[in-house]
Amino acid sequence: MALELTSSFEVVDRRFRRLALPYIHVEKLYTGCRWAEGPAWFAAGRYLVWSDIPNDRMLRWDETDGSVSVFRQPSMNSNGHTVDLQGRLVSCEHLSRCVSRTEFDGQRTVLADRYDGRRLNSPNDVVVRSDRSVWFTDPSYGIDSDYEGDASPSEIGANNVYRIDPANGRVTIVASDFVQPNGLAFSPDESLLYVADTGVTHKRDGPHHVRRFRVAADGCSVSGGEVFAVCPVGVYDGFRIDVHGNLWLSAGDGVHCNASDGSLLGKILIPESVANVCFGGPKLNRLFICGTTSLYSVFLNTRAPPRA
């Protein structure tokens, strides 16, 4: 039961009141997407890039004047994005079935498109660790139909979580027991890896939860994988973790905030299903939210962890 309900927030636990201030409201920044996903913040340029997957384009929102423009079209049905430690865009591309990096001169570098000689399924979401390794999920969504990619059989025959070694580019499986691995993020100290499984989209009794793994001391493998939180409305898709270790999880009724102990603290209420989020703004305290058709934002009393 909610302790408090405003036009923008639902307080479930009193701890949420320290994170979501009652006088701040959700803003709609843009509408007109077919399916918004994968927001990524560019601090140097003060702009946000996100995907409109079925429309095969990426959009850009500028903080300075609030304008929205096409960043890239076609976009290879790009889904999730992140920004690496050098400030370059790293993207998951459905159509090309790869993880790519956009260089400063605009050239595109393929970081991974195969594992053990076989094509990846359709990379979905991606994160870069402080050691510069790239971790990504590879479910089947982009090869299930032509709507968000290219209907094709899986060459790998499994939906895995992978790591790209920063020294030699080698691609290794770090977790394989998933139905549909989706969003992923590290805890602030990078000792934990959280991964969403949205397998209920393919199996009626499939998972709709986030799992938590312990990262090995060498940063190359994980162990554990217990269920951290189960989504009560829809699925937990993309998410981010703040400096205090709270998870900000996209869900069917908005954004759920779960503490590091797994308990639900509260919700940011959005009038459509949410697919992904990211922190941005000069103080990294503005949460950008990709609803189905629209881009939203809200200022919070917390922020993203500092980058190494």
Regions found by a protein language model. Give the residues of each.
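Sequence-structural signature of mature extracellular/luminal beta-sheet repeat domains
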Residues: 1-308
